[in-house]
């Protein structure tokens, strides 16, 4: 037991170090944009200790609507806090600071949970608690290291791996006119392979993910005759798979809490619309850090796959939707 405790203790020390570093880095970024250092410190500490209570799931009916409302409230609250702490920032700067705060919140939460079980195990002498921590620690540490590496990437404002979907959507849209159809989400109308294509992505170049599900729902309801929906996104690779590998599948390629995917599935099912997915494989760390060359190069393969899919699964003059899913940091 002593050896296990020592091993867990070392990992906990590393987590604590990452937690302190992330807090200091994000705090410095906020202070740089503010005139009131003490205000920033106090408000930032409040944010770090904030929490979200999920809706009751005993009766699952309507839980998606409740969850969406809670998450929208959380996002609005964080945006208000950032605006309160800083001065005269545009939407791009605010979204990047929000991303940085969210990363710091994630590392802080991981550290506090591991610390809790470590202390509980030592206090009670319960070997099972310590053994369980040891089993999950490799995954926790991998995720924490990924979050820690994301901070300089976010500060640099360069595209991250998760931005591959918006990057492809941007390449497809070219110089066509875009309009914001729902919150932080834009739509471009183009012609591709003799089809009328509606290109959807989050609004860049800030660190937004938008509401692609809501945007797709709106387009389908407005047009009524959509024949195909294609989602393009980053996907978590399995060990042994190559970064930048492209794969095709059925369904909606979109992560997160499930709200946007639910909307895509619901509208596609109700209207009998075929919905397909094309993804680029990458690790969690590669998804939230500066976009690797292998991932960037996969954009051309994705473009080819999109055109092939359009030809195979739709006909001339039909209306289709192509959604680039992911974080638009550094992608216009």
Q: What does each of the following model-derived ranges do?
A:
Residues 297-303:
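Terminal transmembrane helical module of multi-pass membrane proteins
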Residues 10-163, 167:
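Electropositive, gly/pro-rich neighborhoods at or near active sites that engage anionic ligands
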Residues 319-324:
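Short hydrophobic beta-strand segments
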Residues 1-6:
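N-terminal signal-anchor transmembrane alpha helix of single-pass membrane proteins
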């Amino acid at each position: 037991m002593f050896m296990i405790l020592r091993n867990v203790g070392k990992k906990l020390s590393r987590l604590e170090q990452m937690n302190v570093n992330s807090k200091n880095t994000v705090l410095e970024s906020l202070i740089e944009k503010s005139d009131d250092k003490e205000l920033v410190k106090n408000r930032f500490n409040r944010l770090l200790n904030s929490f979200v209570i999920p809706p009751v799931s005993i009766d699952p009916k309507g839980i998606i609507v409740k969850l969406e409302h809670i998450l929208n409230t959380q996002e609005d609250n964080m945006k208000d806090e950032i605006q309160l702490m800083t001065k005269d920032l545009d939407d791009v700067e605010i979204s990047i600071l929000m991303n940085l705060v969210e990363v710091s919140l994630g590392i802080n939460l991981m550290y506090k949970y591991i610390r809790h079980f470590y202390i509980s195990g030592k206090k009670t002498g319960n070997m099972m608690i310590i053994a369980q921590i040891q089993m999950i620690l490799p995954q926790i540490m991998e995720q924490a290291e990924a979050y820690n590496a994301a901070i300089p990437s976010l500060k640099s404002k360069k595209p991250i791996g998760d931005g591959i979907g918006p990057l492809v959507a941007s390449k497809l849209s070219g110089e066509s006119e875009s309009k914001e159809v729902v919150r932080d989400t834009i739509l471009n109308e183009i012609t591709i392979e003799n089809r009328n294509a509606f290109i959807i992505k989050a609004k860049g170049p800030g660190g937004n993910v938008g509401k692609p599900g809501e945007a797709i729902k709106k387009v389908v309801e407005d047009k009524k005759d959509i024949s195909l929906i294609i989602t393009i996104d980053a996907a978590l690779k399995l060990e042994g798979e190559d970064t930048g590998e492209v794969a095709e599948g059925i369904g909606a390629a979109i992560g997160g809490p499930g709200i946007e995917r639910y909307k895509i599935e619901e509208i596609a099912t109700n209207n009998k619309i075929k919905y397909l997915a094309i993804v680029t494989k990458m690790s969690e760390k590669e998804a939230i850090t500066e976009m690797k060359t292998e991932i960037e190069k996969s954009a051309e393969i994705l473009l080819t796959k999109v055109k092939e899919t359009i030809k195979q699964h739709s006909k001339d003059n039909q209306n289709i939707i192509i959604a680039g899913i992911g974080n638009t940091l550094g992608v216009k």
